[in-house]
UniProtKB/Swiss-Prot annotation:
Disulfide bonds: none annotated. Residues 1-34 are annotated as: Disordered. Transmembrane segments: none annotated. Interacts with ODC1 and thereby sterically blocks ODC homodimerization. GO terms for molecular function: ornithine decarboxylase inhibitor activity. Belongs to the ODC antizyme family. This is Ornithine decarboxylase antizyme. One of its GO terms (biological process) is viral translational frameshifting. InterPro entries: Acyl_CoA_acyltransferase, ODC_AZ, ODC_AZ_sf. One of its GO terms (cellular component) is cytoplasm. SUPFAM superfamilies: Acyl-CoA N-acyltransferases (Nat) (SSF55729). It comes from Pristionchus pacificus. It comes from the Eukaryota.
Length: 142
């Protein structure tokens, strides 16, 4: 079962597009650089089903299935991914994005992320391309 993350365009026609397997509207103008290819490789090395997307100049979103089992996450590669985001991608914030708004940090993978230092993103602080009514997000400030 695959989950789908929908990002909204902030243009007048309110189109939205599934993130999984397609280029999102927010990064259609991002060049295919060695750094972005390496980012994709590093994300997939943590968990093969994960995706990533730029969420502005200094933020990236890691798209994680809502039912992610923490035992399937390669922990040292996850730490390597966070270091890569800081040192190579030069981002200031990594946002874990889940395709369900009803998740909490009380259980599941969000609970694990809390112990690593991720904090819940309040709906009013979501990046403009994420819909707070259909997503749960946690942020890690690099």
């Amino acid at each position: 079962m695959s989950s789908s993350i929908v990002l909204s365009n902030n243009n007048s026609n309110s189109n939205s597009m599934s993130m999984i397997g397609q280029s999102p509207p927010c990064c259609s103008d991002v060049p295919n650089t060695p750094a972005s290819e390496e980012m994709t490789r590093m994300v997939k090395n943590v968990v093969a089903s994960w995706e990533w997307v730029p969420l502005g100049k200094d933020k990236v979103g890691i798209i994680i299935p809502a039912d992610q089992d923490h035992r399937q996450v390669h922990k040292s590669r996850f730490v390597d991914l966070l270091e890569f985001c800081d040192e190579t991608m030069k981002v200031k914030e990594v946002i874990a994005v889940f395709g369900r708004a009803d998740l909490t940090v009380a259980a599941g993978f969000p609970r694990t992320l809390r112990y690593v230092g991720f904090r819940v993103v309040a709906p009013e602080n979501f990046p403009p391309t994420l819909d707070a009514t259909t997503h749960f997000a946690m942020t890690y400030v690099v």
